[in-house]
Swiss-Prot record:
Its EC number is 6.1.1.19. Gene3D superfamilies: Arginyl tRNA synthetase N-terminal domain, HUPs, Isoleucyl-tRNA Synthetase, Domain 1. It is found in: Cytoplasm. Coiled coil: none annotated. GO terms for cellular component: cytoplasm. This is Arginine--tRNA ligase. The keyword Hydrolase does not apply. Belongs to the class-I aminoacyl-tRNA synthetase family. It is an enzyme of class 6 (ligase). The gene is argS. Keywords: Aminoacyl-tRNA synthetase, ATP-binding, Cytoplasm, Ligase, Nucleotide-binding, Protein biosynthesis. Its main location: cytoplasm. GO terms for biological process: arginyl-tRNA aminoacylation.
Length: 566
């Protein structure tokens, strides 16, 4: 086990009473540069307990701590304890662990097989899959991979928006201006054009809105014509969506859209009634949340039709009963914060103790060059266009720089789509993103292609070496600052995965694999690898193999391929 941070916490635990091992572990920091040690422990939080100045506490601990052979020294500076590892021992332990664990390096059984439901993507049927949907899809997909890697049993759910008043609008538009042959030829774009036309015409003729509501009511009452059109629109849209999911290498365990819960809503209404949680307000049924500083949660309209909140409550109850989840995560943008807070509170008021286990994983919105993406106005950037454009762009670069690369169509696909996904996941999820073609296709700096190219570079070195890589190395060759920086970033990787899971933040992994790539490229530039000295060569090749392995795992956890050649 190469977890030197754990070893530091164990040394501290022998001298510090009243603080648990886990808390000590979380207090340990990695200094910004190696002159300040490899691990640092701030004594400021101990000042109140020990009734001494942090500097004094640090001095006393330095005098008491008995170092093992894993460490060269410990000193104190300004209230910090600074631990310096034995570089030889450290390098060998890290490299051995990575090479022995292979593609399972960083994997842990934290979840012990417990079920985690992750609700992500969830586009609307009969509307296009635009770049605004990308964030939920790729964040959810990455969280699925991270939780799975840490021993949870993940259930990926696509809660399709396949029910609602928009279908009434599309039916009205189709009956007034639609062409069946056009829809069969190009379903998504034709349905979008009809949806946009409906809103344009409704501004001039508001009666169309009433007509649309009427068609949706027919759907809810089981009208044969309305349901037949709805099923047709839905099946055509889902076929197109699955093509895009295949491009993104995203999968779901369940496609259960809003319509799946049509027969489960009355039970929710009845239960709310029995618990005296429902109040009538202007003919509609609400749950009053004024006591919790929230507007009322509307669960049933005046005409008896249900709303998103009702369906979400029904879905959550169904998921708990079906999957008995440890957690249920909902990956949607922050504009829905209030909606989730409201119905989460309703679940709690209904007496379900698992209300604490459902969580909204919110993220910032995507705008297109400063404007919000809205399908009703037609101002959308279709995701399929972006992905295909990225693949074409990479194909051009390959033809220019390396036209003889094997499987160049597949490489172009892996790198082009990887660039788009990486661009999204390199940002903290809560940040708004302004989508622009130039940014999405930029391959300079901290980008997906940069990390993928680093993986391909490491793969190339290993192919040229034509030797079996082993962890039986002389680690004395790996103790210089540049090489140690590579090894440190590798050693931190397992904790980075855990941090990403705890915070539900894939960008933590994305940023770290950029750090690994940068550290490796400095190592590659400064240190010839295929040298005459066999012992030195094998030690450096072991570092190359470890980097390749960790980059491959890291890219996989964010849903990106790791090409062997580029």
């Amino acid at each position: 086990m190469s977890d030197f941070k754990q070893k530091v916490s164990e040394l501290l635990g022998t001298q510090i009473e009243g603080i648990g091992q886990r808390e000590l572990l979380e207090m340990i920091e990695v200094p910004p540069n190696s002159e300040m040690g490899d691990f640092a422990f701030p004594c400021f939080r101990l000042a109140k307990t020990f009734r001494k100045a942090p500097q004094v506490i640090a001095e006393e601990l330095v005098a008491k701590i008995q170092l093992t052979d894993d460490f060269e020294k410990v000193d104190n500076t300004g209230g910090y304890l600074n631990f310096f590892v034995n570089r030889n021992t450290y390098a060998k332990a890290v490299i051995q662990e990575v090479l022995s664990k292979g593609d399972q390096y960083g994997s842990r059984n934290l979840g012990e097989g417990k079920n985690i439901c992750i609700d992500y993507s969830a586009p609307n049927v009969a509307k296009p899959f635009h770049v605004g949907h990308l964030r939920s899809t790729v964040i959810g997909n990455s969280l699925y991979r991270i939780y799975d890697f840490l021993g949870y049993n993940c259930i990926g759910i696509n809660h399709l928006g396949d029910w609602g008043t928009q279908f009434g609008k599309v039916i009205v538009a189709y009956k007034n201006w639609g062409d069946k042959a056009e829809i069969e030829k190009e379903p998504i774009n034709t349905l979008l054009a009809l949806y946009v036309k409906f809103h344009d015409e409704a501004e001039k003729n508001p009666d169309l809105e009433d007509e649309a509501r009427g068609w949706f009511t027919k759907m809810e009452k089981g009208d044969e014509e309305a349901l037949s059109l709805w099923k047709w629109f839905s099946s055509e849209t889902i076929k197109e969506l699955k093509k895009i999911y295949a491009l993104l290498d995203v999968h779901f365990d369940h496609y259960s859209g809003e319509s799946f819960y049509n027969d489960k809503m009355d039970v929710v209404i009845d239960e709310l009634n029995k618990q005296n949680l429902l109040k009538e307000s202007q003919g509609a049924n609400i749950v009053d949340l004024e006591e919790y500083n929230m507007p009322p949660c509307l669960v049933q309209k005046k005409d008896g039709s249900t709303l998103y909140a009702t369906r979400d409550i029904a879905a959550a109850i169904y998921r708990k009963n079906t999957f008995n989840f440890e957690k249920c995560l909902y990956v949607t943008d922050y504009s829905q914060n209030l909606h989730f807070a409201q119905w989460f509170k309703v679940i709690e008021l209904m007496g379900y103790d698992w209300a604490k286990d459902i969580e909204h994983i919110s993220f910032g919105r995507v705008t297109h060059e400063g404007r919000r993406i809205q399908s009703r106005k037609g101002s959308v950037v279709l995701l399929e266009e972006v992905l295909n454009g990225a693949v074409e762009r990479i194909s051009e670069i390959i033809e220019e720089k390396n036209p003889n690369v094997e499987n160049k169509e597949q490489v172009a696909k892996d790198v082009g789509i990887g660039a788009i996904v990486f661009n999204d996941l390199s940002n903290n999820r809560i940040k708004d993103i302004s989508f622009s073609w130039d940014t999405a296709f930029s391959f300079e700096g901290e980008t997906g292609p940069y990390v993928q190219y680093t993986h391909a570079r490491a793969s190339s070195v290993l192919r040229k070496a034509e030797v079996a890589i082993t962890d039986h190395i002389n680690a004395a060759h790996l103790t210089d600052d540049v090489t140690m920086n590579v090894i440190k970033t590798i050693e931190q990787f397992p904790q980075v995965i855990v941090d990403a899971q705890r915070k539900n933040e894939p960008s933590i992994i994305t940023r770290h694999i950029v750090n690994i790539a940068q550290a490796f490229n400095r190592f590659y530039h400064d240190h010839p690898i295929l040298v005459e000295d066999e012992e030195l060569k094998m030690a450096r090749l072991a570092v190359v193999q470890a980097v390749k392995q960790v980059l491959s795992v890291g890219l996989s956890l964010i849903g990106i391929k790791a090409p062997e050649k580029m």
